[in-house]
UniProtKB/Swiss-Prot annotation:
Organism: Pectobacterium carotovorum subsp. carotovorum (strain PC1)
The protein's name in its UniProt record: Probable lipid kinase YegS-like
Entry annotation: catalytic residues: 271 (proton acceptor)
Signal peptide limits: none
Binding-site positions, Mg(2+): 215, 218, 220
Keyword Chloroplast (UniProt): no
GO molecular function: ATP binding; lipid kinase activity; magnesium ion binding
Chain positions recorded as ATP binding sites: 40, 66-72, 95
Length: 299
């Protein structure tokens, strides 16, 4: 008789009262599935729970939260030995859920939980930044980063992903270029930029598709740079509607380095990182993740 998998679900504390998820967990437990639930309250909790999952010989670790929770769990999994590394499952419970949305993970709790436990396991890439930071979805710099990091929590709770767009319109006074230089294999660019996006996934900032051709299992990252030469109206149209912009600089690279004369801040799946130099490289097939068969981010 095939044993049911052991699953440890890591739940962001902000969503601890989600009744729909509680009911879904109860239903799967009645069906014989072993589910352990742990709740995070501060940074570092997810890493400890991943280590606990390995001690339990868990088959799955589920990140139940937003993009930041998924990031923290994925990063903790990536540094574990492959032989004992559980498979990642995702339940979208955040403000934007950009990675889950672009992967077409169900928003309904029972379907998402079932996928996270029983779905097809697929090798996927993640990205490493400056040898010690990670992202599974996207790193963004420039105006987009300032908007997503400074949007008030109450606005995000009330309006969801629309809060980022609204806050951007309120804060056009922040719109200023940052000078930097970017190079990678057969690629070099230098100048003033308003937005930089390095995507393993396709969208960030509450649904803005900044890297529309990115795939999570091709061993590459998609780079998109919006030059400060671009006029504001066209920039807004391209950013908010996803329309094609001929002044957007794009490349597909296994690694790249970004250097700047002044500090820049990049948002790594919601976590800010400030430096003058960033080395970003893809880690091919770094973890296994349970994704729907129709996931558009797979080759």
């Amino acid at each position: 008789m095939e044993k049911n998998p052991i699953t440890l679900l890591i739940l962001n504390g902000k969503s601890a009262g989600n009744e729909e998820l509680r009911e879904a967990i109860g239903e799967l437990r009645k069906d014989g599935y072993t589910l352990h639930v742990r709740v995070t309250w501060e940074y570092g909790d997810a890493k400890r729970y991943v280590e606990e999952a390995i001690q339990l010989s868990a088959d799955n670790v589920i990140a139940a939260g937003g993009d930041g929770t998924v990031n923290e769990v994925a990063a903790a999994l990536a540094v574990q030995p492959e032989a004992v590394r559980p498979c990642l499952g995702i339940i979208p419970l955040g403000t934007a859920n950009d990675f889950a949305t672009s992967c077409q993970i169900p928003m309904e709790m029972h379907n998402a939980l079932t996928l996270a436990i029983k779905g097809r396991a697929t090798d996927i890439d993640i990205a490493k930044v400056n040898d010690e930071h990670y992202f599974i979805n996207m790193a963004t710099g420039g105006f987009a980063t300032r908007i997503t990091t400074e949007t008030p929590a109450k606005m995000k709770a009330a309006l969801g992903s629309a809060s980022y767009v609204l806050h951007a319109l309120f804060r056009m006074d922040m719109l200023q270029a940052e000078r930097c230089e970017i190079h990678g294999p057969d690629f070099h660019w230098a100048g003033d930029t308003l937005v930089i996006a390095v995507g393993n996934g396709r969208q960030a900032g509450g649904g803005q598709e900044l890297c529309p051709e990115a795939l999570v299992n091709d061993g590459l990252l998609e780079l998109s740079v919006l030059s400060a030469k671009e006029l504001l109206p066209n920039m807004l149209q391209a950013w908010f509607t996803g329309s094609e912009n001929q002044n957007m600089i794009s490349a597909t690279l296994p690694w790249l380095e970004i250097t700047a004369p002044d500090d820049m801040t990049f948002n790594l799946d919601g976590e800010p990182l400030t430096a003058k130099r960033f080395r970003i490289e893809v880690l091919p097939a770094a973890i296994r993740c349970r994704l729907p068969p129709q996931c558009p981010l797979l080759e």
